[in-house]
Amino acid sequence: MKNKISIIIPVYNTEVYLENCIESLINQAYSNWEAILINDGSTDNSLSIIRNYEKQDSRIKSIDLKVNKGVAHARNTGLDVATGEFIYFLDSDDSLDQYALGLLISNITHHEVIFGSFNKQNKKANLTLPVKHRIKYSKSKFRNESVLNRLFRRTLVDELNLRFDEDYRYYSDLTFLLPLLDYFKTVPTITGYIYKKQWRKDPDSPESLTQHDDVAKIKEYVERFHKLTEVYSENPKAIKFLCNQFISYYCQYVIFVLQEQDIYSEVLEDLSSVVQFIDTHSYSRRISFFIKRELKAIRNKDEKKLRKLLKLHKVLRITSRSLKGRQKLYRTLYNYVFTKLPMQNKTIVFESFLGKNYSDSPKNIYEELINENKEYNYIWVFAKPGKDIPGNAKQVKRLSLAYFYYMARAKYWVSNSRIPKALKKREGNIYLQTWHGTPLKKLVFDMNDVHSANPNYKADFYEQSRRWDYLISANSYSSEIFQRAFKFNNRMFEYGYPRNDILHSDNKTQLMERFKTQLNIPLDKKVILYAPTWRDDEFYKPGQYKFSLRFDLERLQEELGDEYVVLLRTHYFIADHLNTEDFEGFAFNVSKYDDISELYLIADILITDYSSVFFDYANLKRPILFFTYDLEKYRDTLRGFYIDMESELPGPLVFTNDEIIDSIKNIDQVKEQYQAKYDQFYDRFCGWEHGDASKKISGEVFS
């Protein structure tokens, strides 16, 4: 086949993003390509990921360099073995829109090179094929000095002997691109976003090729600038281009580095040498009044003046950005005002399920602290403040100004779900992640494919979990999985879940009567709790999942209504409302009931599917039925399970409403049939639960 594209991908410690990158190639509408992945001495699992895909797809080829030699060497190595008529460069932490390669190859026609447009990872390209009128022509050949997202003819690369200068670790792209300046007058560009750039700012995550030691990068940039201006001294176009590129580099990178780091003495001399050169040559890039003054201060090596100008520039930029929306204003205040205030060492912020509930382990830890009379300033985050809770905690609305203020000032964060990525931890901040269940479904880096509404699920999760100082585990099974699937290496509290303390309390009978009365459930009726999970592939948008009730309430009421009532409890991700109006007195929708642990306590039978609720409920040693009507799809396509559903569960799998009714009518026989398996299950998953997890964690974290 003609028009084969060789995609060259250097790889260095990007296991977090690599699968997403490779999957974006496999999913391309255009199939005539080869991917050459050069493992540049990675110390993580990148090489094994590459080798695994290489076995599955003959278009994927790997090269292992053993020792890290830098991106320039890796790309040159890829060029040496590429067999395609076209060359394309991709970073291993980035990904492509489904139609990216097809758009490039179908529109390059008689041209030697074609450019694509970049996009940040969280935006959608919304492109479809065939595409007409998606090409524009530009005289500005290189708006940035990156080889990424450019499709080159191999004949052009060979004719001009285009290679990357391996003397440069960070800024080698321009040595490949500069020879093209005089080669053509205009460059075609795809107008739609086709390349998804992964911008990462987490200092603990693997670094992309554009994020490293700032002093070394600036010094290398200056060195390369002077070398190239010398090489192209007789080429006015090249000199003008290099001058324009430096100004862009200053505006997009150097300014921010100098504003955040005190490295003036290390780089001012170098920067001044470039500005002095630019002052004697022409450039076409428009620059603002502030930039002109800053460059003048750099030229004159006036550090004091430069500091003042950059400080003023930062204030104006922040003010301008803040005026563009309330949330942007709040995030700006968080980053530049609130986190600069003294940390409140006796303040704890609690949040459960994105502020939807007063529940779960954060609730139990909070109540343990107030029972112990520990003198802290307690803040509870709710989507709708005004809940009736014990103690004197201040309630704040999630994502409000007060929320950002207290998140910035509190020493302690306690949450069972994820806190927004925009909230960067400050030094000294302690984040206790309680988590929300023993895992049945595969998690994060144990998942081969992600079918959720968020295509960046793994990368987002990794960045957010780097903030966790402590993580709670309910059993050794969970500890092993969390360490691997979350890549978590900090302290794990292995005491069981605080939320399950109530299931081991001495006054369970009194509590059951109280909770039944609160829900208007007759004390003489037995309770069936149905608690299903969401389906990853059925959603309206990220965080809002569809759910279709397969539970035949009418039949259940007819067959079991004299003895039982049913509580329906959907996962907090599920957006659909369950209507139980026709079953008043029999079916109760308790999806918005704050604390599911209290529902466990009053439930005589649990019916679930792939929700992890049964791990907690098993503490009570009461019967569990598993309504798994779509088992094959969920097990084999969506997530996959950590345990064998057919052999390890402490109760039967049922697939129809007939089986549910029959099992409930014969629940004593079911319990007897599964007793041995239940005992084994209890020992494995509930053995750490003794009703004192909250007390132990209180003593360890808040001593």
Positions of the model-derived regions?
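Nucleotide-sugar donor-binding/catalytic module of glycosyltransferases
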Residues: 1-219, 528, 616, 697
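C-terminal subregions of glycosyltransferases and related glycan-biosynthesis enzymes
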Residues: 197-335, 371-374, 687-688
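Active-site and donor-binding regions of nucleotide-sugar-utilizing enzymes
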Residues: 347-505
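Conserved catalytic-core segment of nucleotide-activated headgroup transferases in glycan assembly
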Residues: 357-373, 485, 498-580, 654
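Donor nucleotide-activated moiety binding/catalytic core segment of transferases
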Residues: 396-412, 418, 572-615, 648
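A donor-sugar binding/catalytic signature common to diverse glycosyltransferases
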Residues: 413-442, 593-638
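Catalytic binding pocket for nucleotide-activated donors in carbohydrate/polymer assembly enzymes
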Residues: 585, 612-685
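C-terminal alpha-helical cap of glycosyltransferases
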Residues: 690-703
